[in-house]
Amino acid sequence: ACLVGSEMCIRDRDKERTIIHLKLNVGGKPDANTKDLAYWHYSVHNPKSVVSHFEGAVVNINASDFYSENISYVNDWGVEAQNGPQALALKTKADRIAFYNCKFRSFQDTWMTTTRDADRHYVKECWLEGAVDYFYGGGNALVEESTLYNVRSGSVIVAPCHESVKYGYVFRNCVIDGNEQAADGKLKLGRPWHNSPKAVYINTLVKIPLAPEGWTNMGTIPALFAEYNSMDMNGKALDLSCRKTEYETGGKEKRKGECRATITSNEAALYTYENIIKSKDGWDPRSMMEQLPAPAHIRWEQDGLKWDAVPGALGYVLDVNGKIVDITSDTQSLWKSDMKGVVLFCLLYTSPSPRDMRRSR
C-alpha cells in the first residue's frame, strides 16, 4: 500500500495470492425459531464473537481517492457457507474509488457502494461473485469488462437505491456467468431496493440463461432498469421482448409503476467513461491502470545487472524469488548473487503505479 498525495493505492502482483479475507456476517441474535445457529459465531452483533468490533464488512473504504489493483476481497462466511445472512466483502462510502483486476467474493451483499448520488466508482477487468444483491447501494458506478459470477439458483445481481442519480449502475462489455446451480434459467439482473434506482447493461455477454423477465420486484419502482445489445455465448442477440416493464412494491402501501427495459443505440452511446467518470472534475483512474513496456536488453555485467531505461519510469524494484533485493532509480543494480532464480522487475512510474514487468534468470 502507498499514500500518494491524498490518494491511497493498494496494489500487488497476483489477486489469486493476495487476498484480504475474514469470516463475518451481520446476522441478528437467534431466537427460538432459529434453526441454524452456525452464523451467530461469526456475527458482528454477537458480543462474544472475535468480529464483534467490525462494522459488518471485511474492508470499509470511508475516504475518497482510493485505488486498488490485483487484490482479492473475500468474505469467508459467504464463500464457505454459500448462504446468508448478509456478509459484505467490501463497503465503499466515498467518491473517486477505482479497482483494476480485483476479485470480490461472498454470497449475500458482496459489495455495498456509496449511498451518495454524486459519488463515482470505476471498476475494470474485475470479478464480482455472489448470489443475493451482491452489488448494491448508490452512486454512479461504471463497471467495464468484468465478470459477474452467480453461485446459486435464482441469483440476483444488483439492488440499487439511487435517489436522483444521472447514470446509476452501468455495466459495459461485461460477462454474466455462474456455476451449475445458477444456470437454471432463474437468474435476475437486479431488483429495485429504494428510491428511484437505475441500472443499465450494455454489450453484455450472457453465458448462462437469464430468466425471461430479466428483473424482479423489491421495495420501489425503478427509474430505469434496461439493457442494450445483450448477447449469448455465440454473439447472437438475446430476445428482450419478455423483459419486465411493470413493477409492484411490497409492504402495506403497495405501489405499481412502469419502467422500460431497453435503451436505444443513441442512448447507449452516452454511457461513456468520459461522461460518467471524468466529466465532473477530470478524474481519470484509467491512467493508473496503464502498462509501461518491459525493461529491454537485460544483461549481467561485471559490475552488476543492467537494463535499458524505460520512458516514464521513476525507478525499478528488483524481486528475486519473492524477496526485494534492490530499489533504484538507475538502470543498473549493484546486487550480486550466485543464487539462481527469477528476477522480477517492478517499475515505479509517474502515477505512481508499480507494475510487474520482466522476468530474467
Q: Language-model segments: which ranges?
A:
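Sequence-level preference for short, compositionally simple segments enriched
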Residues: S6-S351
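Single conserved hydrophobic/aromatic residue that forms the stacking wall/gate
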Residues: A1-G5, Y349-S360
